[in-house]
UniProtKB/Swiss-Prot annotation:
Source organism, top-level taxon: Viruses
Name this polypeptide is given: Regulatory protein E2
Molecular-function GO terms, alphabetical: DNA binding; DNA-binding transcription factor activity; nucleotide binding
SUPFAM superfamilies assigned: E2 regulatory, transactivation domain, Viral DNA-binding domain
Subunit structure: Binds DNA as homodimer. Interacts with protein E1; this interaction greatly increases E1 DNA-binding activity. Interacts with protein L1; this interaction enhances E2-dependent replication and transcription activation. Interacts with protein L2; this interaction inhibits E2 transcriptional activity but not DNA replication function E2. Interacts with protein E7; this interaction inhibits E7 oncogenic activity. Interacts with host TAF1; this interaction modulates E2-dependent transcriptional regulation. Interacts with host BRD4; this interaction mediates E2 transcriptional activation function.
Predominant location category: host cell
Lineage, highest ranks first: Viruses, Monodnaviria, Shotokuvirae, Cossaviricota, Papovaviricetes
Entry coiled-coil feature ranges: none
Length: 454
């Protein structure tokens, strides 16, 4: 055990040298985390062998030393990957490469330039929340490349861009639901204020009071370097109605009524002429059918026409049966022509249309209902882990899971945004049941959709 204590003391000396040197290069930070990993390995070995203290340092439980060793291994992997990028020669301090900084929002990213954001709810100085935003954010893509982007702040939160994707890592709306009574707040960044004023136009009679509200920024001093605020056009996410009806003048109303009267007269004349043409065509068609049915009746063949009754004699059993069959056929044809797929039913079926003899129209109506899917967006490892857990929990609801995939540019092979995963369902009912019990990991978003065929 003396050898174990000597090794532990040597590790402590090396750690103290790093702390006292104050070096800000990645090589030193990687060495720091490797020493921390070795320290936890010594703790784990000592605990397994019944040693409760190394020098003056108590030995932690096995689970604690194991978890900290895994954290150190993960940090070494991240730092070595960052060292291979174009940002490996930048200045990196112990604080910037600490586990707490990496895990703070946005998680699993390196950050520089912290800025305090104060959000005041209900215009009450006592009802205040403080958040930490970042001037520069270093995030890793799915192909292990690092990108450096600027951080931004608007009325809804703090965000950055992953390509064209706007990623919020702080959202004020959640805390507003907990601490605000009116649902309004102001954002203070240094001496700059972002707030949502009252509506810019008064609502018309009979309408609600929620109008189009714009978010203004009042600047008392220039923002810190590399940190920007963004003004937002609306307070709510849904776009408000921008144009309203104006009261018409008597002259305009009279002219409009005159035009409407002329249009009505024109439509009536057109419909009358069409009706006459249809009547004449229908009369000729009925006349031909009567002649055809009369000739069939005289030859004692079953009648299939609409006007199948003979003029001179009573209606026979075969004639009444054919007449009812004819009416049922015309009624079914009319219902199929009038029926169809409602707009909200398009894309609602999960099965491919079979090769039955239902006719072209029914096949088109069946094909209008497509399989429902859910699109997940997030880190590739998180999506894979979620798929593994979801298969055990929602095995009967989800029909298919896709592998993780990404979009690429139209002219380049660079991946755009985060990874994707598709979940396909048998019906909308099963998808709704899945949404009620779905628990996504942090940083994973979802949206609904339909496919033509699975």
């Amino acid at each position: 055990m003396d050898t174990l204590s000597d090794r532990f003391n040597a590790l402590q000396e090396n750690l103290m040298d790093i702390y006292e040197s104050g070096r800000d290069d990645l090589e030193t930070q990687i060495m720091h985390w490797q020493l921390l990993r070795q320290e936890q390995i010594l703790f784990h070995y000592a605990r397994k062998n019944g040693v409760m203290r190394l020098g003056y340092q108590p030995v932690p439980p096995l689970a604690t030393s194991e978890a900290k060793a895994k954290d150190a291994i993960g940090m070494v992997i991240l730092l070595e990957s960052l060292q291979q990028s174009a940002y490996g020669k930048e200045s990196w301090t112990l604080t910037q490469t600490s586990l707490e900084t990496v895990r703070s929002p946005p998680a699993n990213c390196f950050k520089k330039g912290p800025q305090n954001i104060e959000v005041m709810f209900d215009n009450d100085p006592e009802n205040l929340m403080v958040y930490t935003a970042w001037s520069f954010i270093y995030y890793q893509t799915v192909d292990d490349t690092w990108n450096k982007v600027e951080g931004h702040v608007d009325y809804y939160g703090a965000y950055y861009f992953e390509g064209d994707l706007k990623v919020y890592y702080i959202q004020f709306e959640g805390d507003a639901a907990r601490f605000s009574k009116t649902g309004r707040w102001e954002v203070h960044v240094n001496k700059d204020t972002i707030f949502a004023p009252v509506t810019s136009s008064s609502p018309a009679a009979g309408e609600g009071t929620d109008g189009a509200a714009s978010v203004h920024t009042v600047s008392g001093s220039p923002l810190a370097r590399g940190f920007s605020t963004t003004s937002v056009s609306t307070r709510k996410r849904t776009p408000p109605r921008r144009y309203r009806r104006k009261a018409s003048s008597p002259t305009t109303t009279a002219a409009r009524q005159k035009r409407q009267g002329e249009d009505t007269a024109t439509r009536r004349s057109r419909s009358t002429s069409r009706g006459k043409q249809a009547t004449s065509r229908g009369g000729d068609r009925r006349r031909r059918r009567r002649e055809r049915s009369y000739s069939r009746d005289t030859s004692s063949s079953p009648d299939r026409g609409r006007g199948g009754r003979s003029r001179g004699g009573p209606e026979t059993r075969s004639q009444s049966r054919s007449l009812s069959r004819s009416r049922s056929r015309s009624r079914s044809r009319g219902s199929s022509s009038r029926g169809g797929v409602a707009p909200d039913a398009v894309g609602k079926s999960v099965r491919t249309v079979g090769r039955d003899h239902s006719g072209r129209l029914k096949r088109l109506l069946d094909e209008a209902r497509d399989p429902p899917v859910i699109v997940l967006r997030g880190d590739a490892n998180k999506l894979k882990c979620y798929r593994y857990r979801a298969k055990k929990k929602h095995g009967n609801l989800v029909k298919y899971y896709s592998t993780t995939w990404s979009w690429v540019g139209g002219s380049t092979n660079d991946r755009i945004g985060r990874s994707r995963m598709l979940l396909a369902f048998q019906s909308n009912t099963e998808r709704e049941l899945f949404l009620k019990t779905m628990k996504l990991p942090p940083g994973v978003d979802w949206s609904l959709g339909h496919l033509d065929e699975l």
